[in-house]
């Protein structure tokens, strides 16, 4: 029927036109930009983690932004332009030699967000090129189910999730908590 055709087309349009981009924002404005995007109904993500700051007389838990001056924006072409109208947003991240904004694949974003939500270990962003690690699935601990690469950084085993252009998000991971994924997957 015509109605179901329209519905299908709309569904396809919505599914295919929204992509994850990295908006570069003014220092310390990540959360303000995110709040404004929320009000506009544009999905976004600012990766934060809790850090404990210790002084001699007290300790305080603060939320630190993992990727300063960056906000992930899930937008269609029209929304993508609207975001650039913010005075606090300078531009989108673009790969060297390209003109259109870099897209972070949905699967990478899903893994990254899962890691941030569930990791009990601190997550560090490693922007230096990291040799490809063995593809593994976490089978124990809070990150069970996460697929990533097992890498060694400074002699410690870590699970790494690659993000196009941004490098890898890494967290300490005992080797016994992962199993290799065969080529069958």
PLM regions and their residue ranges:
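A short macromolecule-binding patch
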Residues: 160, 168-178
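A generic beta-sheet turn/junction motif
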Residues: 152-154, 165
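Basic nucleic-acid-binding interfaces
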Residues: 13-137, 177-185
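Short, small-residue-biased leader/transition segments that mark boundaries at the very start
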Residues: 1-7
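Short, surface-exposed beta-strand-loop junctions and turns on beta-sheet-rich folds
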Residues: 90, 166-169
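Short beta-strand-centered aromatic/proline hotspots
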Residues: 145-152
């Amino acid at each position: 029927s015509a109605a179901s055709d329209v519905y299908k087309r709309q569904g396809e349009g919505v599914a295919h036109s929204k992509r994850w981009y990295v908006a570069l924002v003014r220092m310390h404005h990540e959360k303000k930009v995110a709040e404004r995007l929320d009000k506009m109904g544009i999905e976004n993500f600012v990766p934060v983690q809790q850090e404990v700051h210790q002084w001699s007389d007290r300790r305080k838990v603060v939320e630190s932004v993992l990727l300063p001056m960056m906000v992930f924006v899930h937008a269609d072409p029209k929304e993508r332009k609207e975001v650039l109208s913010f005075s606090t947003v300078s531009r989108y991240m673009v790969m060297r030699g390209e003109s259109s904004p870099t897209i972070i694949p949905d699967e990478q974003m899903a893994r990254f967000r899962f890691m941030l939500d569930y990791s009990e270990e601190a997550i560090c962003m490693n922007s230096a090129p990291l040799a490809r690690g063995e593809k593994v699935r976490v089978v124990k601990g809070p990150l069970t189910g996460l697929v990533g690469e097992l890498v060694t950084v400074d002699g410690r085993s870590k699970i790494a999730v690659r993000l196009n252009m941004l490098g890898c998000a890494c967290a300490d991971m005992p080797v016994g908590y992962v199993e290799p994924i065969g080529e069958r997957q």
